[in-house]
Amino acid sequence: MSMQTEQELVALCLALIKDQDSLSAAEKKLTKTTPVSALKPREIDTIRKRSRAGLTHSANVLFDPLGHRAPRAGAVYTPAPIVRSMMTWLAAQGSPARIVDPGAGSGRFILAAGEAFPDAQLVAVEMDPLAALMLRANLSARGWTDRATVMVKDYREVKLPPCAGITAFIGNPPYVRHHDIGEDWKAWYASNFAGYGIKASALAGLHLHFFLQTRLLAKAGDVGAFITSAEWMDVNYGSALRRLLLDELGGIALHVLEPTVEAFPGTATTAAIACFRVGETARPVRVRFIDELTNLNGLTKGTDIPREQLQAASRWSIIVRPSAPAMAGDIELGELFRVHRGQVTGANGIWIAGEHAQGLPDRVKMPAVTKAKDLIQAGAHLNSAEVLRRVIDLPTDLDDFTKEERRRISSFLSWAKLHGADQSYIAQHRRAWWSVGLKAPAPILCTYMARRPPQFTLNACDARHINIAHGLYPREPLAAGIMASLVTWLNKNINTGSGRTYAGGLTKFEPKEIERLRIPSLENLHA
């Protein structure tokens, strides 16, 4: 039986929940206009029994009759084999007196924990009132209302009473990017990290906030395992979490799941399961790269890495998944090239020329690569700038223009100011707000964010580029034939494994990651 509307789902939840006095104000608001469930008592009893059974006939799918609606923003349901492996790991750490799921949804983790630890108190935190109703219904169907507490609030606001035994934290914190996090919470994040002597970036996503809040709530000896997207292992804003795991949260294991494992179905992203025991600062961290669900093995296997090695590493992915052994004579691309991201305009709609720029002198409208597609379609050689758009690149000093040119430029700048071009963060930090400052043409250009390996392209037409591409600039002059051979080699041999895979399956290569790519020596390349 399927619920066709949200009201039907709410009605079913209410039919399953015995103690409705405990509902939060947000949940009660959802129920005000909900009619009595049209399901017959026998049908409701069937749902209750199936929910209590916990699993369907498929060994790989949790039976969660109230959890297959579209999840809340930032939430993606975790496949059952991963949930079970995390529970197996947790069981090996002892018997927790309390289990906390910080982003419980309809209860996938907390229900599995309730089965695995029948004597533990359950604490489920969930902001979405509909998901919280589904969670309560699932708990009620299992008869666990007395041992469970559901908090309908932001996990960062949660306070936990003292607990005599071990508290275990487990779950899949929601993925919300920093753009959607308020300034007050960003300040909270930085301030609390500073309390541990750690500098934290405001670019961190919500899942990193959840790790921090867990440390604030936990005491020595508490344990946990969270599965999140894995980008924090490498990016600059993840450095605070990396330190927290080693120095404060007691990280003891890190299992990284290839996108093909689909830890977050439909997202094709790399996932990481971080396991911790608060207070642990000496033992090695067990790390492993997993390319199939069948290799999870209860999160027991892996290679033990000294904490000092992780502390010294600027990126953890190269430790979890070391690069292939270097061939004799191989070098890093960065020995030959400096790699620079393209210029940020601050307002592409204004600075990429269109009808609004028709009156400007041609000499300030530079042919430029403005889309990754420009390079992908060009392939190994960008021979002509005819197909490229133009970027308006005015100098800081406008005195060299003729009187007529100045008049047209002034008219354009008045229009640009009217549209807020001078108010962007980028514009306000330029020497002159109107001067984009495009970099010199790079002999080789490459894409850096796509669901495919980077496209390396010889820039035969001296096009400029904005920040959708990287430019490769030789440290010393190189012959055209050598650069052509290098581009051919890079396009044949570089894959997405050298970058970082984000939610949505996008693989990103930062400039330093391009510089670290291993390539044949010039002698071998041109042989």
From Swiss-Prot:
Out of the domains of life, which is the source? Bacteria
Q: Which UniProt keywords apply?
A: DNA-binding, Methyltransferase, Restriction system, S-adenosyl-L-methionine, Transferase
The catalytic activity, as recorded, is:
a 2'-deoxyadenosine in DNA + S-adenosyl-L-methionine = an N(6)-methyl-2'-deoxyadenosine in DNA + S-adenosyl-L-homocysteine + H(+)
Q: What is the main EC category here?
A: transferase
Extent of the signal sequence: none
Name the InterPro entries for this protein. Answer: MethylTrfase_TaqI-like_dom, N4_N6_ade-DNA_methylase, SAM-dependent_MTases_sf
One GO term in the molecular function aspect is: site-specific DNA-methyltransferase (adenine-specific) activity
Name the SUPFAM superfamilies on file. Answer: S-adenosyl-L-methionine-dependent methyltransferases
One Pfam family name is: Eco57I
Family (UniProt): Belongs to the N(4)/N(6)-methyltransferase family.
What name does UniProt use for this protein?
Type II methyltransferase M.XamI
